[in-house]
Amino acid sequence: MKTYAPALYTAALLTACSPAADSNHPSGQNAPANTESDGKNITLLNASYDVARDFYKEYNPLFIKTYQSEHPGTSVSIQQSHGGSSKQALSVANGLQADVVTMNQSSDIDLLEKKGLVEKGWQQALPDHAAPYTSTMVFLVRKNNPKQIRDWNDLAKDGVNIVIANPKTSGNGRYAFLGAYGYGLKTTNGNEQEAQKLVASILKNTPVFENGGRAATTTFTQRNIGDVLITFENEANYVSKKLTQGQFEIVYPSYTISAESPVAVVNSVVAKKGTQKTARAYLEYLWSEPAQELAASLYLHPRNPEVLARHKADFPDLDSFSPEEKFGGWDNIMKTYFADGGIFDRLTAQK
């Protein structure tokens, strides 16, 4: 199998390539049926989280160009399905024929592993626990920050309206919830009751939870609802520097949560379609230098240290924590905080 790790990848990029299909199919809608590979015409479906669409829109043609240069006569197209991370995982579990999944928390892929759709030990199949890049949670506020929001505790003040994705269905929303909770624990010396009091106040200031991260962005930026959007750093930069200019500002909290974006091949699908090698190559290429450069240019923290060093100015130094170190593994996190009747539900009921 061809290896695309940065140290081993040497193939030159060619100018001729087939365009990637960039169809966005939200969770709950039927994506186009993928035909089985005949060795010459290959179609992959990538089921991904909501705000990853901008990265994969540019990544797919990059991969196609490279793969086709190494496999003359082969035509590759990539289809995309985007939505809340957990909704996407459920769609795959319920039959969405995705060759690969690219999520923003490991529990969503663990669900597929438990159902026998993804190989056991999937995090060891690729470098960096199968997460080619990371992000963190920040605040996006309106120009000049009229509510003077500087840190998580400011979100609990009266008169502040917050927009986030739904923590029950979206990794984006879960990281927002856990970021606030982790800040509460740190600033109260681990006092659970006080941390929950802070988070309950923040939830009280959140009138509605959007289905996914991009839906939350749309509500905040286009519908002009809310004073602050809690979202991934890359999404906040996309809005403030690429989508609009001069309308929004990014606020980095004093203590925030880091977020890995793990990926995996859906074995049950690729075995049926005969797309194993291409699907594997598609994920391996995420660690190539061109893909890592692309990630950094879109404000995703690359794993390649040389690429990260070149983009150091784009990533402020942050005091951050991982959800695993603060709250235990994702199995425990999901059961304790986001299962029906869990801490999130109990705190939301206080709204």
Placement of each model-derived feature along the sequence:
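N-terminal segment of the mature folded domain
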Residues: 35-169, 312, 343, 348-351
